[in-house]
Amino acid sequence: MAAQLNELWQKTINIIKGELTEVSFNTWIKSITPISIDKDSIRLSVPNQFTKEILENRYKDLIINSMKIITTKKYDIAFLISSEEALETDEDQETDTNNVNTDTSSSMLNPKYKFDSFVIGNSNRFAHAACLAVAEAPAKAYNPLFIYGGVGLGKTHLMQAIGHYILDNNPKAKVVYVSSEKFTNELINSIKDDKNVEFRNKYRNVDVLLIDDVQFIAGKERTQEEFFHTFNALHENNKQIILSSDRPPKEIPTLEDRLRSRFEWGLIADIQAPDFETRIAILKKKADVEHLNIPNDVMVYIATQIKSNIRELEGALIRIVAFSSLTNKEISVDLASEALKDIISSKQNKQITIDLIQDVVSSYFNLRIEDFKSARRTKNIAFPRQIAMYLSRKLTDMSLPKIGEAFGGRDHTTVIHAYEKISSALKEDDDLKYTINEITKRFSPK
């Protein structure tokens, strides 16, 4: 089926190429990767939201009609952002709740996420070396391997690169890549449909298990229980486990201690935001892959303005190329400034509000904003709520009554108590200092 889809797509883009300018073709069509085909629809992977919107609004009909020339059939086309592919696959697999999917092939892996397409810099060199070592010698180098870092820094790329490398060198290897959300959903379905044995066979009879965003199993007792036994079964059988998270194990709240200690058994590698030189290298790599002619001063401008993560960096580049294509203007620093003005100004003008603080703190502790406003006083909610109140008092000009009101109508004395408690604890608690520092970083313009 994959070979049939690739052949169809190659014929399709050959037709499309004759309908577009070279710049438009290279900018929009060349970035598409076919994912799957069924009776009536075809799903295509695209790199970002901006590209998805342009394709849907300007090129979707061209793609559909070009395919119809080849197949005489009008397929429905769905564009998926690369990061959505796993979620979409999860949903497909869950539609048949009477069957636990046992696919352990490379179909779960994005073909773009390989070691040779990963840009190495000071911010990720250690993590890259660790991943390559694991790929070359599964279960012999570091087990488990735990990778952590912020959104869009390349964790998923490195994890899937491990899977590709192992399968390229041993096609018979059983490799499973899964998000923690999918793991949880499959567990729920297996319990509901009395398919526990099939579920356990899928995840405990593999050579390599890659779990992305493992922090989301925190607070889910049944999922943690199941994953604990899965981890033990694989580790005891000398099978490789790779985990990713947005923070180190010690900073994942409501994670069971027995899992936390196991996550720390092997090697922990972090990925930081790319430095200036790495950002330039990433932009050059993207331009080369997409056959884009981008002046050096424009790349310097992008790298100077966009510092947070790789997705935003590549998205800015595509936005500039699109702006150039749609306005028929040559790519220059002035054009780049105009194309990115909304993005840059929104970052520069980002004000810290109570709503923002609640959003960031709840996300950090894997809670809902509603939890902060509820009457619940369990430790896993009360402590993050106090941190959010402390930051609201420290970082905004809102009055104590206004802060209390934002946290479910609490009295101003409750806010004072929270502020004083956190302030006092910060004098001696290094872990709390680290937590506050990590949360505060998320407020800063990037």
UniProtKB/Swiss-Prot annotation:
Region (Domain III, AAA+ region): 108-324
Residues that, per the record, bind ATP: G152, G154, K155, T156
Location(s) in or outside the cell: Cytoplasm
Pfam families from the UniProt entry: Bac_DnaA, Bac_DnaA_C, DnaA_N
A single Gene Ontology CC term: cytoplasm
Superkingdom of origin organism: Bacteria
Chain segments carrying region Domain I, interacts with DnaA modulators: 1-73
Annotated keywords: ATP-binding, Cytoplasm, DNA replication, DNA-binding, Lipid-binding, Nucleotide-binding
Database matches in Gene3D superfamilies: 1.10.1750.10, 1.10.8.60, 3.30.300.180, P-loop containing nucleotide triphosphate hydrolases
UniProt keyword Cell membrane, yes or no: no
Residues covered by region (Domain IV, binds dsDNA): 325-446
SUPFAM superfamilies the record matches: P-loop containing nucleoside triphosphate hydrolases, TrpR-like
Domain II, as annotated region: 73-107
A GO biological process held by the record: regulation of DNA replication
Coiled coil: none
UniProt keyword Protease present: no
Major place of residence: cytoplasm
GO molecular function (one): lipid binding
PANTHER family: CHROMOSOMAL REPLICATION INITIATOR PROTEIN DNAA
Domain notes from UniProt: Domain I is involved in oligomerization and binding regulators, domain II is flexibile and of varying length in different bacteria, domain III forms the AAA+ region, while domain IV binds dsDNA.
Quaternary data: Oligomerizes as a right-handed, spiral filament on DNA at oriC.
Membership in a protein family: Belongs to the DnaA family.
The protein's name: Chromosomal replication initiator protein DnaA
Organism of derivation: Clostridium acetobutylicum (strain ATCC 824 / DSM 792 / JCM 1419 / IAM 19013 / LMG 5710 / NBRC 13948 / NRRL B-527 / VKM B-1787 / 2291 / W)
